[in-house]
Amino acid sequence: MTILKKIMLLGVGLIVLSCQQTKKATFLILPTPQQSTVGEQFSSIAPENLVMAYSPTKDALPNLFDFTKTLQETENESQAQVSFQINKELDLPEQGYFLDITDQRIIIEAKDDAGLFYGFVTLDQIAEDASLQGVNLPIAQIKDYPELSYRSIHWDVKHHLDKETYYYDLIDNMARQKINGVILEIEDKLKYQTHPEIGSADAFSSSQWLAISEYAMERHISISPLVQGLGHASFILKHPTYFELRDNPQSDWAFNPLNQKTYEVQFDLYDEALAITPHGKYLHVGGDEVKTTGRNSGQSALELQLYWLNKVAKYAQQQNRIPIFWDDMPLKEAALMDPIYNTSISNAEVDSIWNANEPKLNAFLDKFPKNCIYMRWNYHTPQTYGNQKAMEWFIKNDLQVMGATAGQTRWTLMPLRESNIDNIKTFAINSIKGNLSGLLLTLWDDDSPHFELYKRGIGAFAEYTWAGDKSTKEEYKSLFRHRTFGPQWKNENFAFIDSLEAPVGAWVNALVVDKSHRNSLKKNNNAKEQLLITLPNANQKGEWAERYAARLSNAKKHYEQTSTNAKKMEMLIEGGAKNEFMIEVYQQVLKLTHFSFETLLLLEQYDKATSEKEVQEAMENIMKQRTKFNLLRNELETVYAQTRILNKPENYILDQDHHRHPANQTINFDWQFYSELLFLDKIEEHFKNQSPFNEGQSKTKLELQ
């Protein structure tokens, strides 16, 4: 090679290096590392050149994702871009790791297998950011470990299953965020061999669930089962075979804890649930929201609950599992629940209540099993002094305690309250300060939003349980957009989830009379007349619009707001944002809310119409709503069905629905649209006598199931 050519090549190299060094790029990791220095300089390693990995200690590569998945092990150190090893002597907590990106080499050193896995997870996020922004990997030094050792997500499958492949996708998604546990509320979604009538016809087999458990464990996620025992037992007690085990013969809610056959059934179900979750550490036995009498035995509800708890705790111990028990009923029986949720009382008042009522708990202290974890669940007010007092009572009495926060409680259609980020963060920080071992994020299936809509809350849980108080709420939201949609979408200008909350919150009861709720419609045989709002009267023009003026004003505001949100979502999709399916699910949420507001505004137009032409046009537009809705429903179901099983089996037995769970009110997917379907029926019945009904319109009626 001539000197001139060498000089020219060197010049080109310097120009390329200069471009690399001056180009701006943003690297954000979820969860945020404990210590991180990501400089403005870039290495010589392009993300697509991550090809070979070398371990001086002969450790095996962990399971890898996306941009690190192409790595292959080599015994030739000089060939490797990545050097990795496990060093149990590292001065780091368990699951910790060091990640060092130099100009020519990436070095990962981990405390244990989990730490090695998490080190590569972080590298993968960095490589993805580099690829999306067209730069090499940055020069970086990271020291990282979790603040809470157990960071678990609740999978509640009681009212529906998702497609089997989706659970594998969810495991990958959680593992990428360093979540390491799942509590699987299995109910009737396992084909039980000992009690086959309990398993739903669409339940997964034991081999299917076992395969999911094994896949999760390979990604450092241990799955433990939750099988409700004392209360919330409708999935068992609705079947005639088990009527004799009911505490109240007329109710399918709770077992009789004094009937020894209760334990024969429960232990059979436990056996099978434990078999499909062999890597789990826990057996969650539930036990919340239940008050039994033992068929009028004369024993108190607290005595009976502790009798049951000791029986199941002993079983768990024999199976080498730690039982977890929802702690609300002992606190409620001792009149100590109000200070937990009452944010208006002073600390002194809380102390006074505890001084008066704590002896009621202490009287039963010797009956609280010591091998049990008492799960202090609080989804709305974890910051209260009363909540802390409750947790401290367990700790000072040498009882194990763990918290439970929520990413989904009883919100309809999608989680609200900014995905409950504030409460998730508060409980995580309090758990860290209290030196607790872990925290659970509950995701209740009662109202059954699509799981994609939980992911911002899951990300917040991952962030604050791992990193602690390192990001504000707004910083986390930006981090979520960065990691979920891509670095170019992290700016607040592209945020759309929060601005959906007000329309969704208003949509819930937009068509329902005041002081009622759409979840109660199915319980009322005359809901169409009694619980839905009235319709305009042709002989009393303007009266309807005046009566519902506030409702219509809100409908107009939210109609316009959803139109703005629709443009933002479309912009993200057209711009190539990642996770397009999540955006599509949010689009369906938006379209459903938009429809209800549009229907109200069309009714207002009819009520205010003065000329015959205006009246006729308004009625025609109203009558088109059924066809519009059918198209909307079909589109929503098509999107949701990509991952979700929409309908229950035809032979499924619906239970008594004690807590108004809409997802358990119909066999098919009608429950999701019950208010809209009923309202459309009411509209058609109301208007067909006022003007000739267009026979070309769909007359599909709500099929009550």
PLM feature spans:
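Bacterial Sec-dependent N-terminal signal peptides
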Residues: 1-28
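Conformational gate/switch positions in structured elements
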Residues: 10, 15, 113-114, 436, ...
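Acidic, contiguous N-terminal accessory segments
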Residues: 19-114, 118, 122-142, 325-330, ...
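Substrate-binding groove of N-acetylhexosamine-processing glycoside hydrolases
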Residues: 29-45, 211-214, 263-271, 275, ...
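A short, charged/proline- and glycine-enriched loop
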Residues: 45-49, 146-151, 370
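Short, solvent-exposed amphipathic alpha-helical segments in soluble enzyme
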Residues: 66-71, 124-125, 170, 390-399
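Short aromatic/hydrophobic-glycine micro-motifs
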Residues: 69-73, 179, 221, 321, ...
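Feature activates predominantly on carbohydrate-active enzymes
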Residues: 90-96, 101-317, 324, 402-405, ...
